[in-house]
Each structure stands twice: as structure tokens, then as C-alpha cells.
């Protein structure tokens, strides 16, 4: 409270609500940065798993994109795992922090982990993504829904349709958005601990602050000013009716900021999970009010914004993913590229 009091005293002619809101925005930005930069488990895929490190051409982004891949067998559906705000350029956070490849080995699902995309929201940006490390083109939606599935079909025998996309934190809303606009490719969307109403209220401001902290990026380069229709297009709450109409299978998880024996007992992880929970509950309410009947909503009385909980959710959803995607578990060798 001392920080808030100092700011209140320093600013005149500004309402209490605006001052506290500004401080809250700055605080959330710092917390997002702190959480996004923490690798907890350091799992990495064990030696012996059939994990490949692919370089997939992306004409839309003008470079090759690194993809970690584990085959689920010929003509298998894919499970795309999307990373958080501070996605690294060397390995996916899913591999760094969870044994996801181990869990899904021989599952009948091809596991696809795109690497990179810090602060991207896995979206097609209006402008070049310019940050502290320079400028690059972000056309992640095009890559994930056109270039990558086409390449995987041709080179790794992966089905281009009937797949799943799962994202955490930043990528939770991205996963739902990709399923909204690409329902044939993604018949299943999993969202963990995300802000599911990003265009609402302080959402654009908070996202902009977080992106600035995580790489020095600008939200306006991504979706323009907050009045731009791109913000509404990428808002799962506003577009929940499309998920219902598509009968997309959804799995939405968010804790309440209280740690359990899984861990994550630190202030940033506790605060941020509690902060985003409200938008998840609003999303469930809108889904139910719209007549949705193909979803799993898990809002336990514990859970913080950390990998221990996201890993547990990914492991828990495995049977549901296999059922929904019609995966056939296999024990034979993975097919090699053409």
C-alpha cells in the first residue's frame, strides 16, 4: 500500500480509480515478466524418446521455424502445444518444464511444439514485431494453420485436420482463437490460466505492458489500438458462440492463486492466477448460457500460475484428447520423413 499512497500523493487532478489502476497495470506487467521467465522442473525429453528437432520453412515469416516433434504414427492427429509470454528460441517451455513427450509417447498423437514466438500471442501481426532484440515478422497464425500442418502432412505423415491445440497463459486465448477460426484443423482447444477477455476493460493496457516487459514489444504493432477490430477478433469471450456452433471440444483450466502440494508458492504465481481466474469463470458462464455442451471446466480451490499445474492438466487431459481425436495408441517405430 505504501507504493499506492506515494503515487496518490504525487498525482493531482486524477481520480483514485485511475491512479490505482495505473499502479495495478505496472504491477501486473512485472509479475507476468517474473512468472514467464521461470523454468521450474527442467525436465527435457529423456534420451531414447523419438523427439525430432525440425526446421520448418515459413514463407510468411521469411525464416525457418524450429519445431520439436514426436510422431504418433502414420496419419495420426496432432497435439499442438503453445508456449507462454516468454517463449524461448531454443526449446519449448513444455519440454523444459514438463515431461510432455514422455507422457504422450506411443499415445497415437503426434506432439508438435513450435519454438519461439515471445509475446506473439501466436497471431498474425499488423506490423513487424520490433523489440529489444530487433525486428522480425510475426505471422504465427498463418504458420500454425497453413505452413506447418502442410509440411507435417508431407514430411511426417501427420493429419492436417482433426487435431488439438493447447496453450497456457499468453497462449490460452490463442488456442481458443485458433480453434474458433480454423475449426476443421482444431477440433479440440485447451486453455490454461489465460486472460480470456483480452479486449475488455484494462486488457489491452495490461497486455501492452506485459509485452513491453517481455522483449520490448508493442501491442499496437500486433492488433493496433484497443479500438481496432483485431482485439475483438482475438477475444475468446466475445467469440464463444463460434466455438459452440463448431462443437469444438474445449478444456479450460484455471487455479485460484492458492498453492497446493504441487508447488508454485510465490507471490507472482499466486497473484497472476487469481487475477485471470475471473475471465475464465466469465467464459464458462457465456459458454453455458450459449448452450455449449462439449466442454470441461476445471476451476479447483488451489493452483497458481506455474508449470507444475499446467503439466498436471496436460497429463490429465490425455484420455480425453485421445477419445476426442480418435487416436490409436501404437507401439511400432515412428515413420521417418520422406
UniProtKB/Swiss-Prot annotation:
It comes from Mycobacterium tuberculosis (strain ATCC 25618 / H37Rv). PANTHER family: DIACYLGLYCEROL ACYLTRANSFERASE_MYCOLYLTRANSFERASE AG85A, ENTEROCHELIN ESTERASE-RELATED. Keywords: Acyltransferase, Cell wall, Cytoplasm, Disulfide bond, Secreted, Signal, Transferase. Its main location: secreted. It comes from the Bacteria. The keyword GTP-binding does not apply. Residues 101-111 are annotated as: Fibronectin-binding. Substrate binds at residues 85-86, 169, 197, 275-278, 282, 305-307. The antigen 85 proteins (FbpA, FbpB, FbpC) are responsible for the high affinity of mycobacteria for fibronectin, a large adhesive glycoprotein, which facilitates the attachment of M.tuberculosis to murine alveolar macrophages (AMs). They also help to maintain the integrity of the cell wall by catalyzing the transfer of mycolic acids to cell wall arabinogalactan, and through the synthesis of alpha,alpha-trehalose dimycolate (TDM, cord factor). It is an enzyme of class 2 (transferase). The active site is at residues 169, 273, 305. It is found in: Secreted, Cell wall; Cytoplasm. Its EC number is 2.3.1.122, 2.3.1.20. GO terms for molecular function: acyltransferase activity, transferring groups other than amino-acyl groups; diacylglycerol O-acyltransferase activity; trehalose O-mycolyltransferase activity; zymogen binding. InterPro entries: AB_hydrolase_fold, Esterase-like, Mycobacterial_A85_antigen, TAT_signal. Residues 1-43 form the signal peptide. This is Diacylglycerol acyltransferase/mycolyltransferase Ag85A. GO terms for cellular component: cytoplasm; extracellular region; peptidoglycan-based cell wall; plasma membrane. Disruption phenotype: Cells lacking this gene produce normally mycoloylated cell wall components. It catalyses: an acyl-CoA + a 1,2-diacyl-sn-glycerol = a triacyl-sn-glycerol + CoA; 2 alpha,alpha'-trehalose 6-mycolate = alpha,alpha'-trehalose 6,6'-bismycolate + alpha,alpha-trehalose. Belongs to the mycobacterial A85 antigen family. Homodimer.
Amino acid at each position: 500500500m505504501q507504493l499506492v499512497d506515494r503515487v496518490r500523493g504525487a498525482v493531482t487532478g486524477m481520480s483514485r480509480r485511475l491512479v490505482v489502476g495505473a499502479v495495478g497495470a505496472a504491477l501486473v506487467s512485472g509479475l507476468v515478466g517474473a512468472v514467464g521467465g521461470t523454468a521450474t522442473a527442467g525436465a527435457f525429453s529423456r534420451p531414447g524418446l523419438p523427439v525430432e528437432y525440425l526446421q520448418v520453412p515459413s514463407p510468411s515469416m521469411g525464416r525457418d521455424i524450429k519445431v520439436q516433434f514426436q510422431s504418433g504414427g502414420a496419419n495420426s492427429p496432432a497435439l499442438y502445444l503453445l508456449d507462454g509470454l516468454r517463449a524461448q528460441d531454443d526449446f519449448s517451455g513444455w519440454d523444459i518444464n514438463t515431461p510432455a513427450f514422455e507422457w504422450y509417447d506411443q499415445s497415437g498423437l503426434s506432439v508438435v511444439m513450435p519454438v519461439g514466438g515471445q509475446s506473439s500471442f501466436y497471431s498474425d501481426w499488423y506490423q513487424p514485431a520490433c523489440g529489444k532484440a530487433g525486428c522480425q515478422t510475426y505471422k504465427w497464425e498463418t504458420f500454425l494453420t497453413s505452413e506447418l500442418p502442410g509440411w507435417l502432412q508431407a514430411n511426417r505423415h501427420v493429419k492436417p485436420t482433426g487435431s488439438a491445440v493447447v496453450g497456457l497463459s499468453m497462449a490460452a486465448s490463442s488456442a481458443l482463437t485458433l480453434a474458433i477460426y480454423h475449426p476443421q484443423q482444431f477440433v479440440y482447444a485447451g486453455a490454461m490460466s489465460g486472460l480470456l477477455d483480452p479486449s475488455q476493460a484494462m486488457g489491452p493496457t495490461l497486455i501492452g505492458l506485459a509485452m513491453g516487459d517481455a522483449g520490448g514489444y508493442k501491442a499496437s504493432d500486433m492488433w493496433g489500438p484497443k479500438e481496432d477490430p483485431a482485439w475483438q477478433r482475438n477475444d475468446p469471450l466475445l467469440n464463444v458462440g463460434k466455438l459452440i456452433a463448431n462443437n469444438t471440444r474445449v478444456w479450460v483450466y484455471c487455479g485460484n492463486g492458492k498453492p497446493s502440494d504441487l508447488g508454485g508458492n510465490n507471490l507472482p504465481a499466486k497473484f497472476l492466477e487469481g487475477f485471470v481466474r475471473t475471465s475464465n469463470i466469465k467464459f464458462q458462464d457465456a459458454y453455458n448460457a450459449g448452450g455449449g455442451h462439449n466442454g470441461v471446466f476445471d476451476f479447483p480451490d488451489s493452483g497458481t500460475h506455474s508449470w507444475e499445474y499446467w503439466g498436471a492438466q496436460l497429463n490429465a487431459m490425455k484420455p480425453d484428447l485421445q477419445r476426442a481425436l480418435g487416436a490409436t495408441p501404437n507401439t511400432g517405430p515412428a515413420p521417418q520423413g520422406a
